[in-house]
């Protein structure tokens, strides 16, 4: 399973706290405000609990768990290019 976390947090200190926590869990930055990595529903729950402690009004954090094959079918648009994750052999490990 792959845990994906997308966030919009206005304060740099709070963003940094969440980023450091996500890295400790083994998630990697895949976009400016998106982290992904191997995990389980329990990992997602841990992220959600930590996010509740960090976010304030106006902030948002989105946490989802998908199967790896679903993640590999993700479509990516990066402003210059478009690709499907599996075509780039892109991994979050």
UniProtKB/Swiss-Prot annotation:
- Please state the Enzyme Commission number of this protein: 3.1.-.-
Indicate which residues the UniProt annotation says bind Mg(2+).
8
Q: Name one Pfam family in it.
A: CRISPR_Cas2
Record keywords, A-Z: Antiviral defense, Endonuclease, Hydrolase, Magnesium, Metal-binding, Nuclease
* CC cofactor: Mg(2+)
What biological-process terms (Gene Ontology) are attached? Answer: defense response to virus; maintenance of CRISPR repeat elements
Family, as annotated: Belongs to the CRISPR-associated endoribonuclease Cas2 protein family.
Tell me, in a sentence or two, what this protein's role is. CRISPR (clustered regularly interspaced short palindromic repeat), is an adaptive immune system that provides protection against mobile genetic elements (viruses, transposable elements and conjugative plasmids). CRISPR clusters contain sequences complementary to antecedent mobile elements and target invading nucleic acids. CRISPR clusters are transcribed and processed into CRISPR RNA (crRNA). Functions as a ssRNA-specific endoribonuclease. Involved in the integration of spacer DNA into the CRISPR cassette.
Please describe the quaternary structure of this protein: Homodimer, forms a heterotetramer with a Cas1 homodimer.
Q: What is this protein called?
A: CRISPR-associated endoribonuclease Cas2
């Amino acid at each position: 399973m792959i845990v994906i976390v997308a966030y919009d947090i206005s304060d740099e200190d709070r963003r940094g706290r969440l980023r450091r926590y996500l890295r400790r869990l083994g998630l990697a930055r895949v976009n400016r405000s998106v982290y992904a990595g191997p995990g389980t529903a329990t990992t997602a729950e841990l992220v959600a609990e930590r996010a509740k402690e960090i976010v304030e009004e106006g902030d948002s954090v989105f946490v989802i768990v998908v199967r790896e094959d679903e993640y590999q079918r993700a479509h990516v648009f990066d402003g210059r290019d478009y690709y499907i994750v599996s075509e780039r052999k892109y991994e979050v490990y």
